[in-house]
Structure formats: C-alpha cells, structure tokens
Amino acid sequence: MADLKPYIAKAASGEPLSLGDAKAAFDIMMSGQATPSQIGGFLMALRVRGETVPEIAGAVASMRSRMIPVIAPDDAMDIVGTGGDQSGSYNVSSCTAFVVAGAGVPVAKHGNRALSSRSGAADTLAALGINIEADADTIGRSISEAGLGFMFAPMHHSAMRHVGPSRVELGTRTIFNLLGPLSNPASVKRQLVGVFAPQWLEPLAHVLKELGSETAWVVYGDGLDEMTTAGTTQVAALENGQIRTFEITPEEVGLRRCSPAELKGGEAAENAKALLGVLEDKDSAYRDIVLLNSGAALVVAGKAENLKDGIAQAVQSIDSGAALAVLQKVIAVSNDKPA
C-alpha cells in the first residue's frame, strides 16, 4: 500500500513537490489509501506554504486520470469559477454559458453545488428544470444537440469521496478549491476561469498552459470570481503560448458600472428566476455582467475579435432568443426528451 507520509513530511518542511510527486501524492489520496488525518495534514501543509504550479498541475493530472469523461467537440469551452469568493452573487458563469452557446460556441459546463453563494451553478440549473445528474452519454448529446451540457462534478469525480470528509472537517480553503475548474470532464482546451483571489491569476494560467489549454482567460473581478461591472477586472490571458496580464473596466467596453449590491443573488429559485429574466431580455445589472463575461468567453473561443465585438454578439444571442432556446433544449435533452 502506497504511503502519503513521505509527501506530508516534504510539504511540511517547506520543500516544493515536483509535478510527478504531487500526482503520486494525490493518487494515494484519491484511491482511498490515506487516512483522513493524513489527508488533512497534507492539504494544510500545502496551504500554509502556498501551493505551486507543478503541485496544482500534478493534482489536476491525478483528478483527470480518474474522471468519467464526456465527449465534446474540439472547439467546446468551459466557463467556470472557483467559488469561494464569499460574495453571494448571481450565477454569472451559468447564465453566460447559455448566451455563449446561443452565439454558436459549444459549452461543456462543469460545476457543483453552492460553495460561497447561497446557490451554486448546480442548484440554480436544477431549479430551472435541468437534470444535473444526467449520465455522460446524455450530456454529450446535450452538447451536440443543444450547444451546452452541464457536468455535475460529483458525478464525474467520484474519487473525491475519499477526500470529502477531510475537507469538510478542515472547513477552510484547500488546493481542491482550485482543481474543479481545471478538471473539466470534456477535456476542453478553451476556458474562461474566475478565481477567488488575485494571487491565483497567473499561477492558474500557467497550470492551464502546462496541461495543454490553447486559449484561456483567468479573471478576478474586484471580489468576484468572474469579470465584474462593479469595479475593475484583472485578467491573466493565455494566448499563443504566452501569458499576458491586463485590466478591464466596464466603461471602456460600453457597459454601465453598477454597485456590488446590484449583483447580490438569493436562493436557487430566486437565482433561476433572475437568470431566466436575463435570457428573456430584461434589462438589469445582472444582464450587463453576463454580457461582459460572454464577450470575454467569445474572445477566448476565437469567435470574437475583441471584447466589444464579443459583447455585441452576446447581445444578439439574447435579443434573437437563441440563448433562451439553448436553455429550453438543455432542459429537454437532460431529461431524455426530444430537444
């Protein structure tokens, strides 16, 4: 039986683990060969020292090797946040996913139940009538027929059950908060990823590059794990093998700046109603932040030349009813009915 103890000692001494060592350590944990105490000790040793790019990449490689995969087109993308920003905001990435799919980009959306908000992606999508526990074949069909499929993380990463109890008992952020957005079961190569703190922007962009992503924007929106219309968004963009950083304000792309209070969400039913309102073309601060994130996603997907062009395409996706049609098709296909 493999032993986690040498890796705990290495991490606790402040020594960084190589990608190979990190993968080996996570393989031990994810296969049920470590005790809850060992898992907790290892995770906190990494957290206190600060997780490195090779360690995150090794952990993701371990998760990806065990996941139940979903078949998606080569040009599919994911739009996802780490959660953990404590903002209680609307489900921006979920709504953005429908708008982007309505603009013609296949979306393989990976998500979970609430972490920092009162309603996570899975909670809100379930409230809209989507079967979040659909099997991999049904999700693949949803992506090809509706343009979007939702992959509920626990259904695809069952090995996480071995680390779940330790995470709950620790009650604080660990490396696993960073791994979900990097472990998409459809192995997409294009991502818009939101992070809960700005220090993770460049490291996660480097991890995505290390793991084979072609284009990605890692974003932090002034307290939100997405691009924001309530302040300045910081971006680390992976494009053509290079990583560059820049900032974006809503005004420079023609959007109204709002107050953080205007982006506050509620329970799943309330968030579902608000999401539907955006897709039904009701003007709101929520619509504006979705347009900003959709514009960025369309740039990442290679569908838009720049952010303003992407936002214009996002407006068209909503105004034409295409985004709402995607939602209706996903509800039908996920429940195994004709689209």
Swiss-Prot record:
Its cofactor is Mg(2+). Disulfide bonds: none annotated. The keyword Metal-binding applies. Anthranilate 2 binds at R167. Signal peptide: none annotated. 5-phospho-alpha-D-ribose 1-diphosphate binds at residues 81, 84-85, 89, 91-94, 109-117, 121. Anthranilate 1 binds at G81, N112. GO terms for biological process: L-tryptophan biosynthetic process. Binds 2 magnesium ions per monomer. Mg(2+) 1 binds at S93, E226. Keywords: Amino-acid biosynthesis, Aromatic amino acid biosynthesis, Glycosyltransferase, Magnesium, Metal-binding, Transferase, Tryptophan biosynthesis. Pathway: Amino-acid biosynthesis; L-tryptophan biosynthesis; L-tryptophan from chorismate: step 2/5. Its EC number is 2.4.2.18. GO terms for molecular function: anthranilate phosphoribosyltransferase activity; magnesium ion binding. InterPro entries: Anthranilate_Pribosyl_Tfrase (IPR005940), Glycosyl_Trfase_fam3 (IPR000312), Glycosyl_Trfase_fam3_N_dom (IPR017459), Glycosyl_Trfase_fam3_N_dom_sf (IPR036320), Nuc_phospho_transferase (IPR035902). It comes from the Bacteria. SUPFAM superfamilies: Nucleoside phosphorylase/phosphoribosyltransferase catalytic domain, Nucleoside phosphorylase/phosphoribosyltransferase N-terminal domain. The keyword ATP-binding does not apply. Mg(2+) 2 binds at D225, E226. One of its GO terms (cellular component) is cytosol. Catalyzes the transfer of the phosphoribosyl group of 5-phosphorylribose-1-pyrophosphate (PRPP) to anthranilate to yield N-(5'-phosphoribosyl)-anthranilate (PRA). Homodimer. Belongs to the anthranilate phosphoribosyltransferase family. This is Anthranilate phosphoribosyltransferase. It comes from Brucella suis (strain ATCC 23445 / NCTC 10510). The gene is trpD.
